[in-house]
């Protein structure tokens, strides 16, 4: 029990009670300040700069490559995927392959471009363009020529 509480209990005059009450309240306030954790300060971080779409010409020259390939077997699909992983666009001519193997390669490359966030587009009969996420394809090629297939099943 603190001394101010004792004084408050024993003194009868209003001035003395006020003085004792004041000292009691002051002690309570001091105790609360000691018990309260320090106030938290707001910390501000600088805002992240938005991603710039401007690339220097020299950088663009270094990263822009288009690889033209004409695979003959399905086993060459992994090499094509490696080009895509290396952030190079690939144009694939599948005319010298059987239709079954060409379909398998397109399926494999579709999964590859999905995994890397790229795109695959048909640009001609049995000709496809696969691009990684750093290459944008703008426009479309209209199909003015008929596609000649060995079978009646047209998957593409």
Swiss-Prot record:
Subcellular location: Cytoplasm
InterPro entries: Cell_div_SepF, Cell_div_SepF/SepF-rel, SepF-like_sf
Statement: the UniProt record of this protein carries the keyword Cell division: yes
Keyword Cell division: yes
Keyword tags: Cell cycle, Cell division, Cytoplasm, Septation
Transmembrane segments: none
Region (Disordered): 23-49
Compositionally biased region (Basic and acidic residues): 23-36
GO cellular component: cytoplasm
Domain of life from the UniProt record: Bacteria
Endpoints of the signal sequence: none
GO biological process, alphabetically ordered: division septum assembly; FtsZ-dependent cytokinesis
Subunit: Homodimer. Interacts with FtsZ.
Sequence similarity: Belongs to the SepF family.
Record function comment: Cell division protein that is part of the divisome complex and is recruited early to the Z-ring. Probably stimulates Z-ring formation, perhaps through the cross-linking of FtsZ protofilaments. Its function overlaps with FtsA.
Name this polypeptide is given: Cell division protein SepF
Gene source species: Bacillus anthracis
